[in-house]
Regions:
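Charged, low-complexity intrinsically disordered terminal segments
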Residues: 7-117, 121-419
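Sec-dependent N-terminal signal peptides
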Residues: 1-7
């Protein structure tokens, strides 16, 4: 079996449910939190000060109030936007919040090493992971641009692996307690804010519903061989997700389909893909166009490789937008499905901590391919000359964005390994 080597710690799971719709992804998180009995553990790269984050925090607080013993959250220190007053109120309520890699004179390398994970685990039995951060734009609620993203709901034994990863990270030196000091008045205002958020939802005025009792495993076929991949907490210990991903790709015999919003292929992966092409394996990669991307600098990194990828024989497709693509997924040989936080770039390979959920199941792999195909319907193909099948090199892109991408090329020699 293809994953016999790559998935050494494979576990049986009951459910592997793809969450494409942003409202489903939000509702599933709400239901998991409200149904928790013993613990809620969450890891997030980004948490903004908006309705999504405040709703999540209000639900975490209420879970603690109703007696859930362990309610803990880790957020990357660089992308923590939760107000201090709210953090103080949560602390007083028994919700523990810590940050990953705060600024440290003793650890200067922490500045570029970030926790890019997005996971919420409940009772060590169920979890959601994928591309969505805690912010409105990832759940279809932003006033301007919303991301096109994907998560997966998993129920079963691999949740224990995810929970153990959380516990290891929580007790490591990489995570620090928050020191927040606010007045009683500010803390009371934060309490009122979270109360108001939940009251509006209880009145049916929100983007999600409370107390639905939804069983997200309902009518889902049982699957086997689910593995929760994660980078080691300490870089010197264990195998990185990049290594495990390369093992799975190395085992491909017919096809490799990858969807990555940021595509700056590390040299080892690029060489591996070119090797698989020579073996007759079909390789397709879906990524953002200059029009849809939210990151001009990584897009400049991709444009450097675009012609080489197409000329090598890779079927490169660029998502037209206008919304940015943010889903991180892959399907190998039409039977192995991968969904997680991992981008095809040097940062995910070497610097960030990442997670990925993998299952070998033809029906689910086809479901994921169908999801990717929906994005392909709004994508153009890149030809051997490094351009879409159009006269214009960068269709429907503003002049200002073209200029920014052109200028970004001059930074690539300095920052490419950190994209």
């Amino acid at each position: 079996m293809m994953l016999a080597v790559a998935l050494t710690g494979a576990a049986r799971a009951d459910v592997f449910r793809i969450l494409d719709d942003p409202r489903d992804a939000a509702q599933a998180r709400v239901d998991l939190i409200q149904q928790a009995d013993s613990e809620i553990h969450a890891l997030y790269f980004l948490a903004r000060n908006d309705r999504i984050t405040l709703t999540a925090l209000a639900l975490l607080r209420d879970a603690r109030r109703r007696g859930v013993p362990s309610v803990r959250l880790i957020v990357d220190a660089n992308f923590m936007r939760i107000p201090k007053a709210v953090l103080a109120h949560l602390r007083d309520e028994g919700v523990e919040v810590r940050v990953y890699h705060p600024v440290s004179v003793r650890h200067p390398s922490w500045l570029v090493r970030r926790m890019h994970e997005k996971v919420v685990i409940v009772d060590g039995e169920r979890y959601i992971t994928g591309g969505r951060n805690l912010a409105e734009a990832y759940f279809g609620m932003a006033r301007r641009k919303n991301y096109v993203d994907r998560d997966v709901y998993v129920e079963g034994a691999s949740a224990g692996d995810a929970d153990q990863h959380f516990e290891t990270l929580w007790s490591s030196e990489h995570v620090s307690r928050l020191k927040v000091h606010v007045s009683k008045r500010e803390s009371a205002s934060a309490e009122e804010l979270l109360d108001r958020v939940l009251f509006e939802l209880s009145c049916g005025n929100g983007f999600v519903k409370l107390d639905t009792g939804t069983d997200w495993s309902h009518e889902q076929r049982a699957v086997a061989e689910v593995d929760f991949l994660h980078d080691p907490v300490d870089a010197a210990e264990g195998e990185r997700v990049a290594y495990r991903l390369a093992e799975i790709i190395e085992g491909a015999t017919t096809s490799i389909v990858i969807e990555s919003p940021y595509l700056v292929p590390p040299k080892p992966l690029l060489a591996l893909l070119e090797k698989k092409l020579k073996e007759g394996v079909y390789v397709q990669i879906v990524t953002n166009s200059l029009r849809s991307t939210d990151g001009v600098l990584p897009q400049a990194g991709y444009l450097k490789y675009r012609r080489r990828l197409a000329r090598a024989g890779i079927d490169v497709r660029e998502y037209k937008g206008p919304a940015p693509l943010h889903a991180k997924s892959a399907v190998v040989d039409g039977r192995v499905a991968l969904i997680g936080s991992y981008n095809i770039d040097p940062r995910s390979q070497n610097l960030n901590t990442e997670v990925m959920c993998v299952v070998e199941d033809e029906a689910l792999a086809q479901e994921l391919l169908d999801s990717i195909d929906l994005h392909l319907q709004n994508a153009w193909r890149i030809h051997g000359n490094g351009r879409p099948a159009r006269v214009e090199r960068y269709p429907n892109v503003s002049h200002a964005k073209k200029v920014r991408a052109w200028l970004a090329r001059f930074l690539l020699p300095i920052v490419e390994n950190q994209l």
